[in-house]
């Protein structure tokens, strides 16, 4: 996990690779403008702070460490650090050749939701009904898998000990160029490009959190 100075991660695919599901224009704007802006602002914010400079990104935005700094700085770290962390996860979950969930994640989903279709409906319903900018997450904690939404660039790890398995960006910049105000269409399209099999590694990481 990155530490200061933070860098914009290179995508694992070309900007036009997800067309027609996501246009090249949207991908370029999303990655090179929005994501990069969060990285630049985060670097400027934590520059010169020895404590913050040593923290990996996921620890920087964690509940434990946010509680150790002043409220104004903590809010900015949630915004800029969360923006960097959230977008990094988002771009990593997309794939030109998505695969179905692996054995570990499949078992957890079946145990928690009954089957994948039930989980898919709950996730999409929560994402579609979320008001304003934010994110929809699949989170693993000691309580098992849960679907959560957060406002703005907040992440579940700002508030609890958990591991975000995947998250979908609900800000308009993620879909407005392609879908205008049709958020439901965007969620349906992006869902088809999620590489679920990769998340077994995150499930393994989460075992250290539970």
Residue ranges of predicted features:
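Feature for soluble, non-membrane regions of globular proteins
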Residues: 1-210
